[in-house]
Swiss-Prot record:
Binding site for ATP: K613
Record-linked PANTHER family: LEUCINE--TRNA LIGASE, MITOCHONDRIAL, LEUCYL-TRNA SYNTHETASE
EC number: 6.1.1.4
Chain ranges for the short sequence motif 'KMSKS' region as given in the UniProt record: 610-614
InterPro entries (alphabetical): aa-tRNA-synth_I_CS (IPR001412), aa-tRNA-synth_Ia (IPR002300), Leu-tRNA-ligase (IPR002302), Leu_tRNA-synth_edit (IPR025709), M/V/L/I-tRNA-synth_anticd-bd (IPR013155), Methionyl/Leucyl_tRNA_Synth (IPR015413), Rossmann-like_a/b/a_fold (IPR014729), tRNAsynth_Ia_anticodon-bd (IPR009080)
Pfam families reported in the protein's UniProt record: Anticodon_1 (PF08264), tRNA-synt_1 (PF00133), tRNA-synt_1_2 (PF13603), tRNA-synt_1g (PF09334)
Full protein name: Leucine--tRNA ligase
Database matches in SUPFAM superfamilies: Anticodon-binding domain of a subclass of class I aminoacyl-tRNA synthetases, Nucleotidylyl transferase, ValRS/IleRS/LeuRS editing domain
UniProt motif ('HIGH' region) ranges: 41-52
HAMAP family on file: Leu_tRNA_synth_B
Organism of this sequence: Streptococcus pyogenes serotype M6 (strain ATCC BAA-946 / MGAS10394)
NCBIfam families documented for this protein: leuS_bact (TIGR00396)
Top-level division of the source organism's lineage: Bacteria
Amino acid sequence: MTFYDHTAIEPKWQAFWADNHTFKTGTDASKPKFYALDMFPYPSGAGLHVGHPEGYTATDILSRFKRAQGHNVLHPMGWDAFGLPAEQYAMDTGNDPAEFTAENIANFKRQINALGFSYDWDREVNTTDPNYYKWTQWIFTKLYEKGLAYEAEVPVNWVEELGTAIANEEVLPDGTSERGGYPVVRKPMRQWMLKITAYAERLLEDLEEVDWPESIKDMQRNWIGKSTGANVTFKVKDTDKDFTVFTTRPDTLFGATYAVLAPEHALVDAITTADQAEAVADYKRQASLKSDLARTDLAKEKTGVWTGSYAINPVNGNEMPVWIADYVLASYGTGAIMAVPAHDERDWEFAKQFNLDIIPVLEGGNVEEAAFTEDGLHINSGFLDGLDKASAIAKMVEWLEAEGVGNEKVTYRLRDWLFSRQRYWGEPIPIIHWEDGTSTAVPESELPLVLPVTKDIRPSGTGESPLANVTDWLEVTREDGVKGRRETNTMPQWAGSSWYYLRYIDPHNTEKLADEELLKQWLPVDIYVGGAEHAVLHLLYARFWHKVLYDLGVVPTKEPFQKLFNQGMILGTSYRDSRGALVATDKVEKRDGSFFHVETGEELEQAPAKMSKSLKNVVNPDDVVEQYGADTLRVYEMFMGPLDASIAWSEEGLEGSRKFLDRVYRLITTKEITEENSGALDKVYNETVKAVTEQVDQMKFNTAIAQLMVFVNAANKEDKLFSDYAKGFVQLIAPFAPHLGEELWQALTASGESISYVPWPSYDKSKLVENDVEIVVQIKGKVKAKLVVAKDLSREELQEVALANEKVQAEITGKDIIKVIAVPNKLVNIVIK
């Protein structure tokens, strides 16, 4: 039996593509464009795992498909190469993180090339290249000039072990850091912030313009968290102090019986009485040790301390005790809430715990038993009594504004973006702080501000980054003799990834971020494929920067990514014991089709789980390519199931994909290829072209491969294969298995040219129609014959054909035919006696 040798074929075609620059981006202005983007990887020391190629294969199939359809295709790859692991490695080993990063990139690139992806490597970007981060810094200076980058003393999530602050999104629900699992404490520090909140409404509105999964849009909507309500001002009794509360339910103000401030609220110390001072100070200290996520956990027991002061409810003059509690965050809203315990579960629990008044102001429910959180007509609410929710809100806002104690207000949950990191391995923030108290941005002519090479990569000990140790870089003197100090914080890893898709469009431009005409030609990105874990942060940050650049006239579109697709996760083979604990694969043996723990003998259940080093179930693509070939890996990952589903890796599935490709190879290389069309494959071939074309366009790659299999099965039943159908089929399979596609194309054409730009096959609609149908002939209700006849034969013709059939003749000879019922295209029923 013939098998193809992937170890010879694959390197041969990879060399051909590289030598001939086969995938250089097309520049013919008369052609339509297609920009296919992958989320570029962080080049870790571990290299690629089999999860990476799933998304990369999808965009590669689309890119090859669109090239064949006559598009200019931009399909680039690059490296998101700043980040903590390289810095940690440098601190542990004393080596330069740049060298470590370069080695990792070389390894990633080798692995990617071995998979036959059609990237245009002339457009490769690397976020750690000064020629790249010059423009990251340039964008920062523009944000600074527009007042969108500012310094603030903010409570940050400080991780002592990492020597840096981390963003809210990087804190796990248990209050530890996502990276390393270290304790996180709240600590006030001078930080750079980006004013993403200035774009909140546009970030929300423009989600309507993009073709993204609704689930991702919802996550962004929730993160932005728009709410409409009112600000209400409360005076503090016997003082000249007041504070403002934002509420979405100003109509419930008559039911506000106490107020709660965040422990960090600026007013707390000023209004705390001497009796309560010690308890308040102690509580503030405890709150500072908790992350925002831990503080707002709904399940935790409510804690709080009274300040000793009272606020005056503006609508009824009632006194409301003012408490502090850690579930109120200084960074959210105004850092103060009015509590309506009758109609809010958290307020109700707090009121019950500390014996505070509960006054119902909405009809329905028993507030002694539980908070009533549904809608009802207003009661105990003076001029609002009897009104429904909408009417009462409108009337209360009108009253607040007339009395000068409040106003209508729209707020967002979105916070400004904490942009600085106390790390070495990141883009230097191009700002100089002068001894006269002013700060200036580094002028564009002096960009890039290059990260200094240093052996001294260790925390400075002051909370500043290791750059504070590099004094000859740090200290500068202006022409007028004024001394200055460079900013020591660096940018987060999110910075370089917020605009990389723009640099791919014009990666070698030294004068500007990218040429306007090229940006007009290529934007927006037509398809962006990557993991759903980036749903909020990366995508929101990139959209924010894009909108700023749009306002500056740098980019021509409001949105960067027209269509987004999240591939599923490839899960590893893993096993669970009776307690539900996962067991590493090297501790498992298979006996008689069941799995057992090597040490305890306990029978285990097979359960797919995320691939991880600890479970020893990470599959390295190098091993798969060596054993089965890159084309097999590509076809298998696309055939596993829908692209957005999470599916377990299977060796059997891999073997099945390889067997299929061997059958394809045999079909084209051993079947007699003829210039004469017998017509036998007309229907299945045209169906295959139609189905594969439509399904690739819709990214339904698994069903496209299934249809290719249908064609192979049909073609194998014929003695000969029509040359045009053989070529068309090879073109259809080439985006999935490009090395094999090229090899078989040469076997059929000997053209010496790549298959990549051969026009995509078309189909003949008339051949999709069945010209023949199978009908059954029943005698006495039993099927006696099956006949293939021309479609749409009349009743009379059908009856004639059926009665002339040999098998039918044998059944009816010597019998009386009572009646013949003929149903066109279906059956003939003969009644005899």
